[in-house]
């Protein structure tokens, strides 16, 4: 390899290192977090003994909050109001931090000066709404399948019955077993 090729490769290597160094802090949020943490720890090593003073919250460069960020958080926390999410995103500047706060169970306050919307008062018609009424009720299987408990079906062969007759037979057999258990 001649001298010009070696010089060219060395120049490419130096250029690559410089470009990586300039782009490093803007490339990934975790890289920004690491540089901010090291900056805070080096500033606070004096009187605090290595611990950050105050709340210990790390200040990150904030991004403007857009609707996509709110939708991501609302997908995980649908019961939160969009203003609560927007306020927390403006404070934290990060969807990840907001989601972590939600998963930890922290409160999401409304922004100062914002009044929470009052849900409209619904009249007492909710109880008469057929969709909200409990439709679960016990069925009387003897009446439903027209089974006479006094009838003797013990001589009937189960495999020879059609579907409806099998249902009646199973209800009759269950009734007889229940009567036998209650007499014991």
Curated annotation (Swiss-Prot):
Instruction: Name the major location.
Output: endoplasmic reticulum
* Domain CUE span(s) in chain numbering: 65-107
Record's compositionally biased regions (Polar residues): 32-45
Residues covered by region (Disordered): 32-63, 106-145
Q: Which Pfam families match?
A: CUE, Cue1_U7BR
Which Gene3D superfamilies does the record associate with it?
1.10.287.4310, DNA helicase RuvA subunit, C-terminal domain
The stretches that face the Cytoplasmic side, renumbered to this chain, are 24-184
Q: Which GO terms describe its biological process?
A: ERAD pathway; establishment of protein localization to endoplasmic reticulum membrane
Q: What is this protein called?
A: Coupling of ubiquitin conjugation to ER degradation protein 1
Gene behind this chain?
CUE1
């Amino acid at each position: 390899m001649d001298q010009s090729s070696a010089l060219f490769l060395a120049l490419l290597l130096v250029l690559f290192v410089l470009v990586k160094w300039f782009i490093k802090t803007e490339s990934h949020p975790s890289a920004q977090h690491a540089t901010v943490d090291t900056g805070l720890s080096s500033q606070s090593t004096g009187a605090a003994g290595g611990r950050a003073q105050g709340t210990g919250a790390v200040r990150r460069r904030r991004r403007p909050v857009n609707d996509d960020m709110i939708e991501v958080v609302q997908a995980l926390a649908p019961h939160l109001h969009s203003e609560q999410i927007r306020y927390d995103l403006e404070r934290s500047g990060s969807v990840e931090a907001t989601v972590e706060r939600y998963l930890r169970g922290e409160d999401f306050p409304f922004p100062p000066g914002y009044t929470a919307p009052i849900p409209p008062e619904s009249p007492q018609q909710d109880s008469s709404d057929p969709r909200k009424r409990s439709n679960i009720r016990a069925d009387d299987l003897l009446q439903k399948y027209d089974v006479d408990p006094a009838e003797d079906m013990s001589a009937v062969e189960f495999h020879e019955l059609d579907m409806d007759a099998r249902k009646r037979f199973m209800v009759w057999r269950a009734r007889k077993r229940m009567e036998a258990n209650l007499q014991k």
